[in-house]
Amino acid sequence: MATTGYRHGIYTSEQATSILPARTVDSAVVFAVGTAPVHTLAGDKARPVNVPQLFYSYDEAVQAMGWDADHCSDYSLQELIYSHFAIYRGAPVVCVNVFDPEKHKSEVADESLTFGTSVLDKDIARLAHGGVCAVELKDELGETTYEAGTDYSVDAVSGLLTRLAEGSIPEGGTVKAGYVYADVSKVTSEDVIGGIDPASGQGTGLELIDEVFPRFRLVPSIVLAPQFCEDPAVAVVMAAKCDGINGLFQAICLVDIPSSGDNAVTKYSDVPGYKEKHNLTDGLMVVCWPKVKLGDNVYGLATHLAGVMAATDGDHDGIPYASPSNKRLDITSSGYVGADGQWNELWLDLTKANYLNGQGIYTVSNFDGGMKTWGGRMACYPSNTDPKDAQDSIRRFFNWYQAQFILTYFAKVDEPLTRRLGQTFLKSEQIKLDGYAAREICLGGSITFDESENPVTDLIDGIMRFHLRITPPPAARDIEAVFEFDTDNLSALFG
């Protein structure tokens, strides 16, 4: 306690602890950009468009983003929300919905429908689309216009029409409907990529990754764009946004090589060529192929791999030093969607799966113990073989450790540059590294403050430079044993 004037007695004071505990950093914070059925939300609820939303549970995400059970595959964030929360129990997830029902919409001029086709209610008819507005009903000949509230009512969210008994629509009558509906197919890759509005300065799409830490104090570590990441233009931007988040942090992105639609790659031997042709070779990118299926739902492998990463980290104290390769996938098959829209299963043997791994591609293996992830390499492999760049667990550990270092010592910025300050860094980090080594999270690590790396010109300008050497364990990808027939043991035949 500070006192002034004449002192007479015993006084105490406090000094900052010379050793700092490490800041906690989540290792598997997913940042995902895509589409959600926000038009299904109740009328009094906000419809989040290009606003980061933080979720820790399935229920929380559905309540905030809406849910369309009849068109699950049409909304890419539904794929992630179900996979990550319901299947793999991962958290947290930050979602950005770019589907704007006020902007992305289409018009139907003359849809014919008949009341009474429902076996449950003879006064019910359903429009082909939900999320409707400006509904206009006419008789079958288009001569009489029916009045909403008098002849019929409409549920704008579901597109459900109800014939009112006191109205003029005949029982079992056929009508023609015109309306405008929210059309998620109007969302493009450009919406997901996003940018900065020059007038308002507001970010959209992937650009909003820089708002995650200021809003939620979470560092994004895994970037996803389900379905849209199959567009190489989106994938390349995802990788670019992973580097220098808030000017400080790094993440990795998980992308899928297309295995449905016009650009589908259906042969394993064609996958590496597609990867190279479209420049999917970034050191912060993981490339996945093919798609996977659970029940009737088809997913991008990248979506499931994100869940496996979160689960693997959770099994290792929330520290990303173990590879998510050779871990169980909660799927029933892997394959691709053909031009006819039908699902085609793929059964890659170990040789084919290893070929893809050797080209820096994650895939699915059913060699032992069911369907499992099979990979371990970042997209930069085999061109870049530096362990910190090429091995996924080491890359993620470096990203995580650097974020922890930044946040642990950020409060020390602008403190007096003294020997005590340097010792705080050295002692705190070495204690932590020794602890990691004892727990075999790292094989070893050290931190130094070398005079040779800190010239006087930097020191007088307030620049301190520490050198950390860390060795997270490589994944044991190739385990070999040599067997030999030992003739010496033949002597046992003679007692």
How does the language model describe each region?
Residues 110-129:
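Surface-exposed beta-strand/loop patches in extracellular or lumenal glycoproteins
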Residues 93, 103-111, 115, 157, ...:
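Compositionally biased, low-complexity/repeat regions
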Residues 2-59, 66-106, 123, 128, ...:
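A glycine- and small-residue-enriched flexible loop/hinge signal that marks low-structured segments
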Residues 131, 218-219, 441-443:
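Short loop/turn motifs at secondary-structure junctions
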Residues 136-137, 141-191:
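Surface-exposed interaction regions enriched in Ser/Thr/Asp/Glu
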Residues 388-452:
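Acidic, low-complexity glycine/serine/threonine-rich segments
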Residues 274-277, 299, 304-307, 427-449, ...:
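Sequence/fold signature of self-assembling virion shell proteins
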Residues 151-160, 258-259, 292-294, 454-462:
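Short, ordered beta-strand-loop transition motifs
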